[in-house]
Protein backbone atom coordinates (compact mmCIF):
# COMPACT_ATOMS: atom_id res chain seq x y z
CA UNK A 1 0.00 0.00 0.00
CA UNK A 2 1.41 3.41 -0.97
CA UNK A 3 1.86 6.00 1.76
CA UNK A 4 -0.86 8.28 0.37
CA UNK A 5 -3.39 5.46 0.45
CA UNK A 6 -2.43 4.52 4.00
CA UNK A 7 -3.03 8.11 5.08
CA UNK A 8 -6.54 8.10 3.53
CA UNK A 9 -7.44 4.90 5.38
CA UNK A 10 -6.61 6.68 8.62
CA UNK A 11 -8.50 9.90 7.81
CA UNK A 12 -5.31 11.93 8.17
CA UNK A 13 -5.79 14.85 5.79
CA UNK A 14 -2.59 16.51 7.00
CA UNK A 15 -0.54 13.45 6.10
CA UNK A 16 -2.26 13.18 2.70
CA UNK A 17 -1.50 16.81 1.93
CA UNK A 18 2.12 16.42 3.00
CA UNK A 19 2.60 13.30 0.86
CA UNK A 20 1.05 14.98 -2.17
CA UNK A 21 3.29 18.00 -1.66
CA UNK A 22 6.26 15.60 -1.65
CA UNK A 23 5.22 14.17 -5.02
CA UNK A 24 3.23 11.05 -4.05
CA UNK A 25 1.39 9.47 -7.00
CA UNK A 26 -2.23 10.44 -6.37
CA UNK A 27 -3.50 7.77 -8.77
CA UNK A 28 -1.43 4.82 -7.61
CA UNK A 29 -3.66 1.76 -7.47
CA UNK A 30 -3.69 -1.74 -6.02
CA UNK A 31 -4.45 -4.78 -8.16
CA UNK A 32 -8.03 -4.77 -6.87
CA UNK A 33 -8.62 -1.31 -8.34
CA UNK A 34 -8.43 0.48 -4.98
CA UNK A 35 -6.99 3.98 -5.36
CA UNK A 36 -6.57 6.62 -2.66
CA UNK A 37 -9.90 8.18 -3.67
CA UNK A 38 -11.64 4.78 -3.67
CA UNK A 39 -10.23 4.05 -0.22
CA UNK A 40 -11.57 7.23 1.38
CA UNK A 41 -14.98 6.77 -0.34
CA UNK A 42 -15.18 3.20 0.91
CA UNK A 43 -14.28 4.15 4.47
CA UNK A 44 -15.86 7.60 4.70
CA UNK A 45 -16.96 8.13 8.30
CA UNK A 46 -20.12 10.09 8.99
CA UNK A 47 -18.68 11.78 12.05
CA UNK A 48 -15.49 13.16 10.51
CA UNK A 49 -15.56 16.30 8.39
CA UNK A 50 -11.92 15.53 7.54
CA UNK A 51 -13.03 12.59 5.36
CA UNK A 52 -15.06 14.90 3.12
CA UNK A 53 -12.17 17.38 3.06
CA UNK A 54 -9.82 14.55 2.05
CA UNK A 55 -12.04 13.67 -0.94
CA UNK A 56 -12.16 17.33 -1.90
CA UNK A 57 -8.37 17.64 -1.60
CA UNK A 58 -7.73 14.53 -3.72
CA UNK A 59 -10.05 15.76 -6.47
CA UNK A 60 -8.52 19.26 -6.42
CA UNK A 61 -5.05 17.71 -6.75
CA UNK A 62 -6.08 15.72 -9.83
CA UNK A 63 -7.33 12.35 -8.57
CA UNK A 64 -9.08 10.37 -11.33
CA UNK A 65 -12.69 10.06 -10.13
CA UNK A 66 -13.29 7.02 -12.37
CA UNK A 67 -10.04 5.15 -11.68
CA UNK A 68 -10.49 1.39 -11.24
CA UNK A 69 -9.81 -1.91 -13.00
CA UNK A 70 -12.35 -4.14 -14.74
CA UNK A 71 -14.65 -5.95 -12.35
CA UNK A 72 -14.12 -3.55 -9.44
CA UNK A 73 -16.00 -0.56 -8.04
CA UNK A 74 -15.28 3.03 -8.99
CA UNK A 75 -14.97 5.62 -6.18
CA UNK A 76 -18.62 6.57 -6.81
CA UNK A 77 -19.75 2.96 -6.31
CA UNK A 78 -17.72 2.61 -3.11
CA UNK A 79 -19.36 5.76 -1.77
CA UNK A 80 -22.87 4.50 -2.64
CA UNK A 81 -22.14 1.18 -0.95
CA UNK A 82 -20.91 3.09 2.09
CA UNK A 83 -24.04 5.27 2.13
CA UNK A 84 -26.38 2.30 1.84
CA UNK A 85 -24.75 -0.03 4.33
CA UNK A 86 -23.62 2.25 7.12
CA UNK A 87 -26.43 4.75 7.65
CA UNK A 88 -28.07 4.41 11.05
CA UNK A 89 -31.67 3.30 11.28
CA UNK A 90 -34.14 6.02 12.17
CA UNK A 91 -36.62 6.02 15.01
CA UNK A 92 -40.32 6.64 14.33
CA UNK A 93 -39.99 10.15 15.79
CA UNK A 94 -37.53 11.08 13.03
CA UNK A 95 -39.43 9.67 10.06
CA UNK A 96 -41.68 12.70 9.53
CA UNK A 97 -38.76 15.12 9.55
CA UNK A 98 -36.88 12.90 7.08
CA UNK A 99 -39.95 12.81 4.87
CA UNK A 100 -40.15 16.62 4.89
CA UNK A 101 -36.44 16.78 4.12
CA UNK A 102 -36.87 14.35 1.23
CA UNK A 103 -39.67 16.39 -0.29
CA UNK A 104 -37.64 19.60 -0.31
CA UNK A 105 -36.24 20.74 -3.66
CA UNK A 106 -33.82 23.12 -1.95
CA UNK A 107 -30.40 21.48 -2.26
CA UNK A 108 -28.87 23.69 0.47
CA UNK A 109 -31.56 22.57 2.93
CA UNK A 110 -31.37 19.02 1.64
CA UNK A 111 -27.82 18.61 2.91
CA UNK A 112 -28.17 20.46 6.23
CA UNK A 113 -28.33 17.31 8.36
CA UNK A 114 -25.93 15.06 10.20
CA UNK A 115 -25.18 13.10 7.01
CA UNK A 116 -24.19 16.13 4.95
CA UNK A 117 -20.58 14.96 4.58
CA UNK A 118 -21.63 11.79 2.75
CA UNK A 119 -24.20 13.40 0.49
CA UNK A 120 -21.99 16.36 -0.26
CA UNK A 121 -19.24 13.88 -1.13
CA UNK A 122 -21.63 12.18 -3.55
CA UNK A 123 -22.44 15.52 -5.18
CA UNK A 124 -18.76 16.40 -5.29
CA UNK A 125 -17.87 13.22 -7.21
CA UNK A 126 -20.73 13.69 -9.67
CA UNK A 127 -19.96 17.37 -10.20
CA UNK A 128 -16.36 16.46 -11.02
CA UNK A 129 -17.09 13.92 -13.74
CA UNK A 130 -17.80 10.63 -11.96
CA UNK A 131 -19.22 8.26 -14.57
CA UNK A 132 -22.82 7.71 -13.56
CA UNK A 133 -23.18 4.77 -15.97
CA UNK A 134 -19.94 2.96 -15.05
CA UNK A 135 -20.49 -0.79 -14.61
CA UNK A 136 -19.10 -3.39 -12.26
CA UNK A 137 -20.44 -6.91 -12.82
CA UNK A 138 -23.30 -5.39 -14.79
CA UNK A 139 -24.29 -2.93 -12.06
CA UNK A 140 -24.40 0.83 -12.51
CA UNK A 141 -24.32 3.18 -9.50
CA UNK A 142 -28.14 3.46 -9.66
CA UNK A 143 -28.61 -0.33 -9.80
CA UNK A 144 -26.24 -0.66 -6.85
CA UNK A 145 -28.11 2.00 -4.85
CA UNK A 146 -31.46 0.30 -5.53
CA UNK A 147 -30.04 -3.14 -4.75
CA UNK A 148 -28.78 -1.95 -1.35
CA UNK A 149 -31.85 0.15 -0.56
CA UNK A 150 -32.96 -1.18 2.79
CA UNK A 151 -32.83 2.14 4.64
CA UNK A 152 -34.99 5.25 4.45
CA UNK A 153 -31.94 7.36 3.59
CA UNK A 154 -31.37 5.47 0.33
CA UNK A 155 -34.12 7.65 -1.14
CA UNK A 156 -31.79 10.65 -0.99
CA UNK A 157 -28.86 9.33 -2.97
CA UNK A 158 -31.19 7.68 -5.49
CA UNK A 159 -32.74 11.11 -6.07
CA UNK A 160 -29.28 12.67 -6.50
CA UNK A 161 -28.31 10.05 -9.10
CA UNK A 162 -31.56 10.57 -10.99
CA UNK A 163 -31.11 14.35 -11.02
CA UNK A 164 -27.72 13.75 -12.65
CA UNK A 165 -29.36 11.70 -15.40
CA UNK A 166 -28.88 8.08 -14.34
CA UNK A 167 -30.65 5.68 -16.72
CA UNK A 168 -33.59 3.86 -15.18
CA UNK A 169 -34.80 1.51 -17.93
CA UNK A 170 -31.81 -0.82 -17.74
CA UNK A 171 -31.10 -4.22 -16.22
CA UNK A 172 -28.25 -5.87 -14.36
CA UNK A 173 -26.51 -9.11 -15.35
CA UNK A 174 -29.14 -11.02 -13.37
CA UNK A 175 -31.92 -9.18 -15.26
CA UNK A 176 -33.02 -6.89 -12.42
CA UNK A 177 -34.11 -3.34 -13.21
CA UNK A 178 -33.79 -0.47 -10.69
CA UNK A 179 -37.57 -0.59 -10.22
CA UNK A 180 -37.50 -4.34 -9.48
CA UNK A 181 -34.70 -3.94 -6.94
CA UNK A 182 -36.44 -1.09 -5.14
CA UNK A 183 -39.77 -2.92 -5.02
CA UNK A 184 -38.12 -6.05 -3.67
CA UNK A 185 -36.61 -4.02 -0.83
CA UNK A 186 -39.83 -2.20 0.09
CA UNK A 187 -40.10 -2.90 3.81
CA UNK A 188 -41.07 0.57 5.03
CA UNK A 189 -43.45 3.06 3.45
CA UNK A 190 -40.71 5.51 2.48
CA UNK A 191 -39.24 2.91 0.12
CA UNK A 192 -42.46 3.28 -1.84
CA UNK A 193 -41.60 6.96 -2.03
CA UNK A 194 -38.25 5.92 -3.48
CA UNK A 195 -40.15 4.02 -6.20
CA UNK A 196 -42.24 7.14 -6.76
CA UNK A 197 -39.05 9.19 -7.14
CA UNK A 198 -37.71 6.65 -9.66
CA UNK A 199 -40.83 7.16 -11.76
CA UNK A 200 -41.07 10.93 -11.27
CA UNK A 201 -37.44 12.02 -11.59
CA UNK A 202 -36.01 9.13 -13.58
CA UNK A 203 -38.95 8.68 -15.94
CA UNK A 204 -38.82 4.97 -15.20
CA UNK A 205 -41.25 3.02 -17.37
CA UNK A 206 -43.37 1.13 -14.86
CA UNK A 207 -44.17 -1.47 -17.55
CA UNK A 208 -40.57 -1.86 -18.77
CA UNK A 209 -39.83 -5.50 -19.62
CA UNK A 210 -36.40 -7.00 -19.10
CA UNK A 211 -34.75 -9.55 -21.40
CA UNK A 212 -37.07 -12.34 -20.19
CA UNK A 213 -40.16 -10.16 -20.49
CA UNK A 214 -40.65 -9.51 -16.79
CA UNK A 215 -42.05 -6.23 -15.53
CA UNK A 216 -41.56 -5.10 -11.94
CA UNK A 217 -45.12 -6.29 -11.22
CA UNK A 218 -44.52 -9.77 -12.63
CA UNK A 219 -41.22 -9.99 -10.76
CA UNK A 220 -42.87 -9.10 -7.44
CA UNK A 221 -45.70 -11.59 -7.93
CA UNK A 222 -43.16 -14.29 -8.79
CA UNK A 223 -40.82 -13.87 -5.82
CA UNK A 224 -42.30 -11.54 -3.19
CA UNK A 225 -44.96 -11.65 -0.49
CA UNK A 226 -45.31 -7.84 -0.35
CA UNK A 227 -48.89 -7.32 -1.53
CA UNK A 228 -48.63 -3.62 -0.55
CA UNK A 229 -45.91 -3.14 -3.18
CA UNK A 230 -48.06 -4.91 -5.78
CA UNK A 231 -50.93 -2.53 -5.06
CA UNK A 232 -48.56 0.45 -5.15
CA UNK A 233 -47.39 -0.47 -8.67
CA UNK A 234 -50.94 -1.01 -9.87
CA UNK A 235 -51.96 2.39 -8.48
CA UNK A 236 -49.07 3.92 -10.43
CA UNK A 237 -50.35 2.40 -13.68
CA UNK A 238 -48.71 -1.03 -13.91
CA UNK A 239 -50.47 -3.23 -16.47
CA UNK A 240 -51.50 -6.54 -14.82
CA UNK A 241 -52.06 -8.30 -18.15
CA UNK A 242 -48.57 -7.99 -19.65
CA UNK A 243 -47.06 -11.42 -20.40
CA UNK A 244 -43.43 -12.43 -19.91
CA UNK A 245 -41.48 -14.55 -22.41
CA UNK A 246 -43.24 -17.66 -21.06
CA UNK A 247 -46.62 -16.07 -21.63
CA UNK A 248 -47.34 -15.81 -17.90
CA UNK A 249 -48.91 -12.75 -16.29
CA UNK A 250 -48.56 -11.50 -12.73
CA UNK A 251 -51.79 -13.36 -11.90
CA UNK A 252 -50.34 -16.69 -13.10
CA UNK A 253 -47.54 -16.40 -10.53
CA UNK A 254 -49.71 -15.08 -7.68
CA UNK A 255 -52.19 -17.95 -8.11
CA UNK A 256 -49.42 -20.52 -8.39
CA UNK A 257 -47.89 -19.27 -5.12
CA UNK A 258 -51.29 -19.14 -3.33
CA UNK A 259 -50.82 -15.44 -2.54
CA UNK A 260 -54.48 -14.74 -1.72
CA UNK A 261 -54.08 -11.03 -1.07
CA UNK A 262 -52.09 -10.48 -4.27
CA UNK A 263 -54.70 -12.38 -6.28
CA UNK A 264 -57.48 -10.21 -4.91
CA UNK A 265 -55.56 -6.99 -5.59
CA UNK A 266 -54.76 -8.06 -9.16
CA UNK A 267 -58.40 -8.99 -9.84
CA UNK A 268 -59.49 -5.64 -8.43
CA UNK A 269 -57.28 -3.97 -11.05
CA UNK A 270 -58.79 -6.03 -13.89
CA UNK A 271 -56.20 -8.78 -14.22
CA UNK A 272 -57.56 -11.37 -16.66
CA UNK A 273 -57.49 -15.01 -15.48
CA UNK A 274 -58.21 -16.23 -19.00
CA UNK A 275 -54.89 -15.23 -20.61
CA UNK A 276 -53.16 -18.29 -22.10
CA UNK A 277 -49.40 -18.80 -21.64
CA UNK A 278 -47.08 -20.49 -24.15
CA UNK A 279 -47.89 -23.90 -22.68
CA UNK A 280 -51.53 -23.29 -23.54
CA UNK A 281 -52.55 -22.81 -19.91
CA UNK A 282 -54.45 -20.13 -18.05
CA UNK A 283 -54.73 -19.82 -14.27
CA UNK A 284 -57.47 -22.48 -14.23
CA UNK A 285 -55.45 -25.14 -16.06
CA UNK A 286 -53.93 -26.64 -12.91
CA UNK A 287 -57.09 -26.28 -10.87
CA UNK A 288 -56.23 -29.30 -8.71
CA UNK A 289 -53.21 -27.36 -7.43
CA UNK A 290 -55.16 -24.20 -6.61
CA UNK A 291 -56.39 -23.70 -3.06
CA UNK A 292 -60.04 -23.20 -2.15
CA UNK A 293 -59.16 -19.69 -0.94
CA UNK A 294 -57.99 -18.62 -4.40
CA UNK A 295 -61.08 -20.15 -6.05
CA UNK A 296 -63.32 -18.26 -3.61
CA UNK A 297 -61.60 -15.03 -4.62
CA UNK A 298 -62.10 -15.78 -8.32
CA UNK A 299 -65.76 -16.53 -7.66
CA UNK A 300 -66.22 -13.26 -5.77
CA UNK A 301 -65.08 -11.41 -8.87
CA UNK A 302 -67.62 -13.30 -10.99
CA UNK A 303 -64.96 -15.20 -12.92
CA UNK A 304 -66.50 -18.04 -14.91
CA UNK A 305 -64.52 -21.25 -14.29
CA UNK A 306 -65.35 -24.13 -16.62
CA UNK A 307 -64.01 -27.51 -15.47
CA UNK A 308 -63.40 -30.33 -17.90
CA UNK A 309 -64.02 -33.93 -16.84
CA UNK A 310 -60.24 -34.45 -16.68
CA UNK A 311 -59.83 -31.47 -14.34
CA UNK A 312 -62.57 -32.75 -12.05
CA UNK A 313 -60.87 -36.12 -11.95
CA UNK A 314 -57.50 -34.52 -11.09
CA UNK A 315 -59.11 -32.51 -8.28
CA UNK A 316 -60.69 -35.62 -6.77
CA UNK A 317 -57.32 -37.40 -6.85
CA UNK A 318 -55.78 -34.86 -4.48
CA UNK A 319 -54.91 -36.08 -0.94
CA UNK A 320 -57.89 -34.25 0.56
CA UNK A 321 -60.93 -35.75 -1.16
CA UNK A 322 -63.31 -33.65 0.96
CA UNK A 323 -61.62 -30.43 -0.12
CA UNK A 324 -61.73 -31.64 -3.72
CA UNK A 325 -65.48 -32.18 -3.54
CA UNK A 326 -65.91 -28.77 -1.89
CA UNK A 327 -63.81 -27.13 -4.60
CA UNK A 328 -65.85 -28.67 -7.43
CA UNK A 329 -69.10 -27.74 -5.67
CA UNK A 330 -67.96 -24.15 -5.25
CA UNK A 331 -66.99 -23.86 -8.92
CA UNK A 332 -70.21 -25.44 -10.20
CA UNK A 333 -72.32 -23.24 -7.92
CA UNK A 334 -70.50 -20.15 -9.18
CA UNK A 335 -71.01 -21.27 -12.80
CA UNK A 336 -74.77 -21.57 -12.25
CA UNK A 337 -74.93 -18.16 -10.56
CA UNK A 338 -72.96 -16.56 -13.39
CA UNK A 339 -75.16 -18.20 -16.03
CA UNK A 340 -78.28 -16.81 -14.32
CA UNK A 341 -76.67 -13.38 -13.93
CA UNK A 342 -75.58 -13.26 -17.57
CA UNK A 343 -79.09 -14.25 -18.69
CA UNK A 344 -80.66 -11.64 -16.41
CA UNK A 345 -78.31 -8.89 -17.55
CA UNK A 346 -79.07 -9.77 -21.17
CA UNK A 347 -82.85 -9.83 -20.66
CA UNK A 348 -83.26 -6.73 -18.46
CA UNK A 349 -82.75 -4.10 -21.21
CA UNK A 350 -85.28 -5.82 -23.48
CA UNK A 351 -87.86 -6.18 -20.72
CA UNK A 352 -87.36 -2.64 -19.47
CA UNK A 353 -87.84 -1.14 -22.91
CA UNK A 354 -90.94 -3.25 -23.45
CA UNK A 355 -92.40 -2.09 -20.13
CA UNK A 356 -91.48 1.56 -20.64
CA UNK A 357 -92.95 1.79 -24.13
CA UNK A 358 -96.08 -0.27 -23.48
CA UNK A 359 -99.19 1.68 -24.50
CA UNK A 360 -100.52 1.65 -20.93
CA UNK A 361 -97.23 2.70 -19.30
CA UNK A 362 -96.99 6.04 -17.51
CA UNK A 363 -94.32 7.21 -19.94
CA UNK A 364 -96.52 6.61 -22.97
CA UNK A 365 -99.55 8.23 -21.31
CA UNK A 366 -97.48 11.35 -20.60
CA UNK A 367 -96.22 11.47 -24.19
CA UNK A 368 -99.80 11.10 -25.46
CA UNK A 369 -101.00 13.83 -23.07
CA UNK A 370 -98.21 16.17 -24.26
CA UNK A 371 -99.31 15.65 -27.85
CA UNK A 372 -102.92 16.45 -26.96
CA UNK A 373 -101.84 19.59 -25.06
CA UNK A 374 -99.89 20.85 -28.07
CA UNK A 375 -102.93 20.35 -30.27
CA UNK A 376 -105.35 21.89 -27.72
CA UNK A 377 -107.53 18.76 -27.74
CA UNK A 378 -109.24 19.65 -24.46
CA UNK A 379 -112.11 17.22 -24.97
CA UNK A 380 -109.66 14.32 -25.23
CA UNK A 381 -107.64 15.53 -22.23
CA UNK A 382 -110.48 15.88 -19.74
CA UNK A 383 -111.84 12.36 -19.59
CA UNK A 384 -112.73 10.01 -16.77
CA UNK A 385 -109.81 7.73 -17.50
CA UNK A 386 -107.36 10.64 -17.13
CA UNK A 387 -108.55 11.81 -13.70
CA UNK A 388 -106.07 9.53 -11.92
CA UNK A 389 -103.29 11.20 -13.90
CA UNK A 390 -104.41 14.67 -12.80
CA UNK A 391 -104.32 13.48 -9.17
CA UNK A 392 -100.92 11.88 -9.70
CA UNK A 393 -99.52 15.11 -11.16
CA UNK A 394 -101.34 17.21 -8.52
CA UNK A 395 -102.82 19.67 -11.04
CA UNK A 396 -106.11 21.55 -10.88
CA UNK A 397 -106.11 23.67 -14.06
CA UNK A 398 -105.32 23.13 -17.72
CA UNK A 399 -102.39 25.56 -17.49
CA UNK A 400 -100.88 23.60 -14.57
CA UNK A 401 -101.36 20.40 -16.53
CA UNK A 402 -99.67 21.82 -19.64
CA UNK A 403 -96.73 23.09 -17.56
CA UNK A 404 -96.23 19.74 -15.77
CA UNK A 405 -96.57 17.71 -18.96
CA UNK A 406 -94.13 19.99 -20.81
CA UNK A 407 -91.55 19.71 -18.03
CA UNK A 408 -91.85 15.93 -17.83
CA UNK A 409 -91.60 15.32 -21.58
CA UNK A 410 -89.29 18.10 -22.78
CA UNK A 411 -86.41 15.67 -23.37
CA UNK A 412 -88.52 13.20 -25.34
CA UNK A 413 -87.86 13.16 -29.04
UniProtKB/Swiss-Prot annotation:
Q: Does the keyword Zinc apply?
A: no
Q: Where does each ANK repeat begin and end? A: 1-28, 32-67, 68-104, 105-134, 137-170, 174-208, 212-242, 246-275
Pfam families linked: Ank_2 (PF12796)
Q: Which UniProt keyword terms apply here?
A: ANK repeat, Repeat
InterPro entries according to UniProt: Ankyrin_rpt, Ankyrin_rpt-contain_sf
Q: What is this protein called?
A: Putative ankyrin repeat protein L92
Originating organism? Acanthamoeba polyphaga mimivirus
Amino acid sequence: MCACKFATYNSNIGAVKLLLDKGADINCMRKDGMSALSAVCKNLDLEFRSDFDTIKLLIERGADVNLTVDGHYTPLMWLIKNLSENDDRFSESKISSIKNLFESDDDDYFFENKRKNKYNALKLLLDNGANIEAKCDGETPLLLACKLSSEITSTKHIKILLKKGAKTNIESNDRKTPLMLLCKNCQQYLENEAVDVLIKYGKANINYQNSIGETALIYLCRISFMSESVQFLLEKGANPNIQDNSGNTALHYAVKRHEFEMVEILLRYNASPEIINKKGKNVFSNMHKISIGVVEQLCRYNINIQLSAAQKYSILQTPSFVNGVKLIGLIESNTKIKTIMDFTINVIPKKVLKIIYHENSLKMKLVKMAWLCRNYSIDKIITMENFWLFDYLNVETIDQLKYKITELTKYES
